[in-house]
From Swiss-Prot:
InterPro entries: LPCAT1-like, Plipid/glycerol_acylTrfase. It comes from the Eukaryota. This is Glycerol-3-phosphate acyltransferase 9. Residues 369-373 are annotated as: Endoplasmic reticulum targeting. It is found in: Endoplasmic reticulum membrane. Pathway: Glycerolipid metabolism; triacylglycerol biosynthesis. It is an enzyme of class 2 (transferase). The gene is GPAT9. Pfam families: Acyltransferase.
């Protein structure tokens, strides 16, 4: 039998049907050869620079990764370590968690049994009342840290009450305030929160001079700026603590510092906070998790390990702008805590890109197409 038997032999006429001659469909005298110098379709669709920019933004998104939790590396998925992991889960949830809940409840009982009478009976003695309330706030924050089995190591001199000074720190979670507050009763600048956190803000934390604002209200900025200036001038005011990033970052990066804290004409005392993620990631992603669930996550971990550095106070240099001063302090905090600096505004986390930004990108792309047309 011939070797070609069983194979489909395609005739020339069949090939002609599959691949018709384009010239047969053109008017007489026309040719498919384009005149030299004309724009080809290949040139018009050459958008490789735009695609390169878009792909680069996806692959190396230095903004989004500032607000992502780092998943722990799996270590227990083998036959030898998995039983140990299961035993650890039982210990953390069935032994440590109930003990920590009892510790926190006991702390609240002591705190409220003292705070309410002091607030009611010492209304006319503001100096004494504020001093006792300051001690009580430090105490309840210590109970909170104990409920996570917090292992916190402080470096440097303890903050003191002095006029015309402000403390600034990098921000990972709302527990930053608790970790710092157990050592010194700071008056903090904080976003107004709903629920039980908002109740504590408007009652207990109000007693130490904390200042609240609503990020969505533009008029709050002027009110807060005035309160800041008045607070730093007070000789008896609690030390003022500001988180100039304005949002929680995952403790691997620092975003831009707001310049408001650096234009108060006072001494700035930097504080660097670094969490060890060996047991739990202390980063609070407020978009995905409530603060209550965040606390439960901490209370069911083995421990929260943290280091705090009180760095050398800084003053603005001659000829230095507020933005330059803020960047210099950010350099100090980033270097001490081992954090990477990124040139992003943390408030972009709460807002969508402006339509003007999209219009500028569209205009830039249109200009590149027009420039290519003019070249032809």
């Amino acid at each position: 039998m011939s070797s070609t038997a069983g194979r489909l032999v395609t005739s020339k006429s069949e090939l002609d049907l599959d691949h018709p001659n384009i010239e047969d469909y053109l008017p007489s005298g026309s040719s498919i050869n384009e005149p030299r110098g004309k724009l080809s379709l290949r040139d018009l669709l050459d958008i490789s620079p735009t695609l390169t920019e878009a792909a680069g933004a996806i692959v190396d998104d230095s903004f989004t990764r500032c607000f992502k939790s780092n998943p722990p590396e799996p270590w227990n998925w083998n036959i030898y370590l998995f039983p140990l992991y299961c035993f650890g889960v039982v210990v953390r949830y069935c032994i440590l968690f109930p003990l920590r809940c009892f510790t926190l409840a006991f702390g609240w009982i002591i705190f409220l049994s003292l705070f309410i009478p002091v607030n009611a009976l010492l209304k006319g003695q503001d100096r004494l009342r504020k001093k006792i309330e300051r001690v009580l706030v430090e105490m309840i924050c210590s109970f909170f840290v104990a409920s996570w089995t917090g292992v916190v190591k402080y470096h440097g001199p303890r903050p003191s009450i002095r006029p015309k000074q402000v403390y600034v720190a990098n921000h990972t979670s709302m527990i930053d305030f608790i970790v710092l507050e157990q050592m010194t009763a700071f008056a903090v600048i904080m976003q107004k929160h709903p629920g039980w956190v908002g109740l504590l803000q408007s009652t207990i934390l109000e007693s130490v001079g904390c200042i609240w604002f609503n990020r969505s209200e533009a008029k709050d900025r002027e009110i807060v700026a005035k309160k800041l200036r008045d607070h730093v001038q007070g000789a008896d005011s609690n030390p003022l603590l500001i988180f100039p990033e304005g949002t929680c970052v995952n403790n691997n990066y620092t975003v831009m510092f707001k310049k408001g804290a650096f234009e108060l004409d006072c001494t700035v005392c930097p504080i660097a906070i670094k969490y060890n993620k060996i047991f739990v990631d202390a980063f609070w992603n407020s978009r995905k998790q409530s603060f209550t669930m965040h606390l439960l996550q901490l209370m069911t971990s083995w421990a929260v390990v943290c280091e705090v550095w009180y760095l050398e106070p800084q003053t603005i240099r001659p000829g230095e702008t507020g933005i330059e001063f803020a960047e210099r302090v950010r350099d100090m905090i980033s270097l001490r805590a081992g954090l990477k600096k990124v040139p992003w505004d943390g408030y972009l986390k709460y807002s969508r890109p402006s339509p003007k930004h999209s219009e500028r990108k569209q205009q830039s792309f249109a200009e590149s197409i027009l420039a290519r047309l003019e070249e032809k």
